[in-house]
């Protein structure tokens, strides 16, 4: 059964056959069998499932998935409904409020962004419970580098949001002058005050998309408390 069912599939078909990926797959089989790994194995590629290649307008790079129970579901920075909003995402929502006036929602479920063309991509797609960066250096970086290179090849202008050193290391792969790179410190409480707050990435992204004839992103994540009744 194919891993991907949309237009990413033919683009990444070769990648899934490369020796590094086959080795990564064997490593993951053993990890999922013997440990608690996040996200659920069916959610690993959700960034690509929710945002087909043709639809990508924005790339928001994260590091590795959240490593607490029930948080990660395959989209960078996003958490499932009913899970408390983590500190970095709370700071993203604060900046969004200050930038565009969006109200701060009661959840951190970012599928609405993904469905509009925001590729919510972590550079490493799996993690052991409670152990940040535990799957770093196992092969995911090669895979996500390829995803970034493919987006870089697009003719349509794309905005790359690179927050923090880890994401900014990928800048060398973004060589197409059509695209816009917006860099800032990571939204983590440890660094947000050093220039993440006030850098207005959401309005800048929408201004760039509009200027190039692309539909802007509706960044407002709605409350789900009322809808859950």
Curated annotation (Swiss-Prot):
GO terms for cellular component: cytoplasm. It catalyses: Hydrolyzes single-stranded DNA or mismatched double-stranded DNA and polynucleotides, releasing free uracil. Its main location: cytoplasm. One of its GO terms (biological process) is base-excision repair, AP site formation via deaminated base removal. InterPro entries: UDG_fam1 (IPR002043), Ura-DNA_Glyclase_AS (IPR018085), Uracil-DNA_glycosylase-like (IPR005122), Uracil-DNA_glycosylase-like_sf (IPR036895). Its EC number is 3.2.2.27. Keywords: Cytoplasm, DNA damage, DNA repair, Hydrolase. Disulfide bonds: none annotated. GO terms for molecular function: uracil DNA N-glycosylase activity. Pfam families: UDG. SUPFAM superfamilies: Uracil-DNA glycosylase-like (SSF52141). Excises uracil residues from the DNA which can arise as a result of misincorporation of dUMP residues by DNA polymerase or due to deamination of cytosine. This is Uracil-DNA glycosylase. It comes from Geobacillus kaustophilus (strain HTA426).
């Amino acid at each position: 059964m194919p891993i991907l069912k949309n237009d990413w599939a033919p683009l990444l078909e070769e990648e899934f056959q490369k020796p590094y990926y086959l080795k990564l797959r064997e490593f993951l089989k053993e990890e999922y069998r013997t440990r608690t790994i996040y996200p659920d194995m069916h959610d690993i590629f959700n960034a690509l499932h929710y945002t087909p290649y043709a639809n990508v307008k924005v790339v928001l790079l994260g590091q590795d998935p959240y490593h607490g129970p029930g948080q990660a579901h395959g989209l960078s920075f996003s958490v499932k409904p009913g899970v408390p909003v983590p500190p970095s995402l709370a700071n993203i929502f604060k900046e969004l409020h200050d930038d565009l006036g969006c109200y701060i929602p009661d959840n951190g479920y970012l599928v609405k962004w993904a469905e509009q063309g925001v590729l919510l991509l972590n550079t490493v797609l799996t993690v052991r419970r409670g152990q940040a960066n535990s799957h770093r250096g196992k092969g995911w970086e090669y895979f996500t580098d390829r995803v970034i290179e493919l987006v870089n090849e697009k003719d349509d202008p794309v905005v790359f949001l690179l927050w923090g050193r880890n994401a900014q290391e990928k800048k060398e792969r973004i060589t197409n002058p059509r695209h816009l790179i917006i860099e800032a410190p990571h939204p983590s409480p440890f660094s947000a005050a050093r220039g993440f707050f006030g850098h207005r990435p959401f309005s800048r992204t929408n201004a760039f998309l509009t200027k190039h004839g692309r539909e802007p992103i509706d960044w407002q994540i709605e409350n789900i408390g009322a809808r859950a009744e």
